[in-house]
């Protein structure tokens, strides 16, 4: 168990979030957003998309737009768009982390951005921050994690929570709690590859939804385990690499 006086891995990750975001990174995020929208629109017209639309017709209504024309509450919108975006997956794979960040981060950030009525720049900055955390957590998990777990979901939930925390302007303490609550919800096993169905899409959508919930809970004051990434009973027990070998502070 790490000392309570030692910054947790989560806190170290969040310390990086204060760095200025370059315009070229915002432009790259905007390009990924356009590509992701294309994937979502295409997925809407598939069998899986039709099933998601049928579910959305009975989901809790709200102010957040979803592809298909439904206006849902924030969490439901993240689930709907996050699932749709995974049907024809955007190829933004980070090979080292084995994560497709857009599947979870775009859907979560879009939902919260609509609810909070943030600026386009704030949205893109949140996406960049979410991408970084999802990728770094994926690198921590390593490729062995991917053998049994769907890394886009299990690691992407941390990125989704980070993006939402950025949009809500949470401080480091609150954002640490957001990532803690995200880790408590991390899920997604690869049995969905062994059988037909739409469970892979559910995993990405659910992680987007969980990212929204994690940030909202943290904003409300719900504390969580600071050492969710490296503690004795941490999320993703397969995290075996010493932190120094991950070179956390390198870009």
Summary of predicted features, one role per range:
Residues 2-249:
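N-terminal core-entry segment
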């Amino acid at each position: 168990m790490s000392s309570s006086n030692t910054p947790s891995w989560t806190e170290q990750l969040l310390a990086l979030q204060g760095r200025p975001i370059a315009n070229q990174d915002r432009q790259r995020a905007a390009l990924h957003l356009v590509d992701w929208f294309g994937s979502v629109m295409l997925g809407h017209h598939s069998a899986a998309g039709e099933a998601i639309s049928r579910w959305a017709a009975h989901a809790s209504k709200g102010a957040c737009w979803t592809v298909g024309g439904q206006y849902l509450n924030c969490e439901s919108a993240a689930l709907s768009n996050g699932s749709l975006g995974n049907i024809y997956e955007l190829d933004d794979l980070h090979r080292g982390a084995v994560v497709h960040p857009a599947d979870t981060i775009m859907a979560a950030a879009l939902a919260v951005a609509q609810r909070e009525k943030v600026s386009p720049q704030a949205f893109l900055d949140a996406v960049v921050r979410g991408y970084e955390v999802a990728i770094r957590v994926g690198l921590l998990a390593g490729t062995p994690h991917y053998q049994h777990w769907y890394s886009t979901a299990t690691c992407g939930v941390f990125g989704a929570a980070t993006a939402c925390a950025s949009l809500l302007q949470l401080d480091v303490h609150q954002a640490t709690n957001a990532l803690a609550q995200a880790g408590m919800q991390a899920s997604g096993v690869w049995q969905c590859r062994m059988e037909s169905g739409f469970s892979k899409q559910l995993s990405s959508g659910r992680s987007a939804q969980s990212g929204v919930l994690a940030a909202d809970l943290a904003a409300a004051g719900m504390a969580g385990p600071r050492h969710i990434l490296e503690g004795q009973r941490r999320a993703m027990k397969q995290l075996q690499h010493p932190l120094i070998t991950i070179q956390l502070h390198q870009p």
